[in-house]
Amino acid sequence: MVIVKKISAIEVLDSRGNPTIKTKVELCDGSIGEAIVPSGASTGKRERLELRDGGEAFGGKGVLKAIKNVNSMIAEEICGKDAYNQKAIDDAMLALDGTDNYSRIGANAVLGVSMAVARAAANSLNIPLYRYLGGANACTLPVPMFNIINGGAHANNSVDFQEFMIMPFGFSKFSNALRAATEVYQTLKKILNDLGHSTAVGDEGGF
């Protein structure tokens, strides 16, 4: 058992220049875990609620309300709990919120704490995060996915589909899969240039 000692959060900017939450969790043995919450450009109707501030700052996309929830009610609930019991941590935050979609304290507030606790626990055990989450038998990394053409809400063009993605299967190392995808991306760029098409990138980095 290792106890969660301190939880704090600050506002940072994501890759699109929009505010998001960076959460830091410190355990009693000195281990630290940090996490920055991702955010999509489009939102599905079943997605959990990101708590945003509204108002004028950052076009209403500020996350100071969610940060306040992390630094107050979530910290009060989670500090003192066993960081090695991830399910108990997550269940405690779900119970604290009391809604089906985290509309009270914000899914962005909850996700940052959950990820940071997991990373702190992995660091406490001096093992990689994938090993901590996957257990002793975790030996296969997921196949990476790469967005190479953007449309829909992710680009200012007439393409109906939002994402065209590739998955480089069959490589023994992640680095080789990454290289293969990069080569496909650069080859596609050359083909588009040769055909006189735009190679400006969309919201997800695809053409």
From Swiss-Prot:
Check the record and name the Gene3D superfamilies matching this protein. Enolase-like C-terminal domain, Enolase-like, N-terminal domain
> Some GO term, biological process aspect, for this entry: which one?
glycolytic process
**Which keywords are on file for this protein?**
Cytoplasm, Glycolysis, Lyase, Magnesium, Metal-binding, Secreted
Name the pathway. Carbohydrate degradation; glycolysis; pyruvate from D-glyceraldehyde 3-phosphate: step 4/5
Q: What is its EC number?
A: 4.2.1.11
Which positions are catalytic residues? E204
* Cross-referenced SMART domains: Enolase_C, Enolase_N
Catalytic activities: (2R)-2-phosphoglycerate = phosphoenolpyruvate + H2O
Q: Name one GO cellular component term.
A: phosphopyruvate hydratase complex
Q: Which residues form a coiled coil?
A: none
Q: Where in the cell is it found?
A: Cytoplasm; Secreted; Cell surface
Q: Which residues bind (2R)-2-phosphoglycerate?
A: Q162
Note one Pfam family from the annotation.
Answer: Enolase_C
- Which GO molecular function entries does the Swiss-Prot or TrEMBL record give? magnesium ion binding; phosphopyruvate hydratase activity
Q: Where mainly located? A: cytoplasm
Note whether Magnesium occurs among the keywords. yes
**Family assignment from sequence similarity:** Belongs to the enolase family.
Report the function annotation for this chain: Catalyzes the reversible conversion of 2-phosphoglycerate (2-PG) into phosphoenolpyruvate (PEP). It is essential for the degradation of carbohydrates via glycolysis.
Q: Which PANTHER family match?
A: ENOLASE (PTHR11902:SF1)
Q: What is this protein called?
A: Enolase
Native source species: Campylobacter fetus
Supply the source organism's classification: Bacteria, Pseudomonadati, Campylobacterota, Epsilonproteobacteria, Campylobacterales
